[in-house]
Amino acid sequence: MDKLNFLIIVAPKNNGDKTIKKLGKLINYPSVSRGRGTAPNSALATLGIGEPEKDVIFCFALKDDVEKIYDILYNKLGFIQKHLGIALTVPVSAVGGRLTYDLLSGDKTDLRTHKKGWFNV
């Protein structure tokens, strides 16, 4: 189960849906929330952070796809430039069982017919 990663992507305000669309099938179960920093505007300008409001994307991806995801973020969405975004991954070493792992990693198996020997609905 160590091949699954939880991604947190901080994108420019109103770019969450665009980011999700660009990443396409490389990510699973994306969710966008609005985020707002707490630093005063003068500190933001000094640090080169830009606007305090951002889109925060939470999603899952397979470890083998993380490099492709970063490539899209940096080269196609411009995250390499100041003010445009940041991303990080956290390995998911344990989840609530094999079925949960399969679902989060993109297995679209119908739960009612899921019969791999360890879970039946």
What residue spans do the PLM features occupy?
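Positively charged, small/polar-rich N-terminal and surface patches that mediate targeting and assembly
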Residues: 1-121
